[in-house]
């Protein structure tokens, strides 16, 4: 059934390309968006992938929102608003950002997410093809889509955070030839010189130094149980959070965690408007453009209201109930963070979506209640936590010296 919907979506996108002039003054947007979705669908359909191909896809995909091209990108609310007016411009920029999550779905082979992404765009494009477009109609479609699929989306997201069987990233860490920096393109995340140079640097270190770094990290987590007198015997999994490029250390950490009975859970930070937060949680990479991410931090303003907040909490609770056994054996997060990034000073744009006062209150209420739900299933007094931080090459010419000082401290 999913494969049939996927094929129908590809046909519909090609039809849209043929009939795009019927969307009148919006034709440039819908033509571009159809191309974008056809591109990710083609990536999904390509089952045999070389590292060189993954690298090429990655560079093409992220180039469009790069700082050099962002001024004229449909992902830029300022540009979209200037071109299509505020009401349509904000919606189009939101939709563009949401469709960009399709690249990750294609790389990971997540057909369900790819299909529903395509279907959201096609339902909106049909309004314009039939001349029935109106901002409120589009917002209604977005609300219904997010509500209808949030149960599935949150169930998968909670599973990602609790189930070691979802091992997309774990396989990259454990099975790749880490001597080749191009393996980093397997993630689908933006790969900059930071990630490549970090991996190259770690590959030059003696194995005993890599092991020592991993041991410090793992021991810090393990000691949380010992110092706080927490029974670790029921625990079977640990969430490893890191910045791409640190795979040699992560691989060794996975081995050391396994020695104390913990399997790795490694998931990326959220990519859709339903799973993104203001802070990235999971494995991360450099941003292709921090301004783009800043511009879209409140995209949920399109549909977030009291009804949706309550539904989201219900979905969140149901997902934890579904994976309560996995939650019980979860030992906590082990975080490997970085420092030395070039400071980012955002530009506050009038055109960006913003939460209303009521939406802000609802967002705070959701965060509080979602934390309460999580703590019912993953009890704070029964889990550990550790955090360690290393510099990245962006810090400057003395990167290796600073790294050594941190390692030896």
Give names to the regions the model predicted:
Residues 1-409:
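Active-site bordering "gate/hinge" segments
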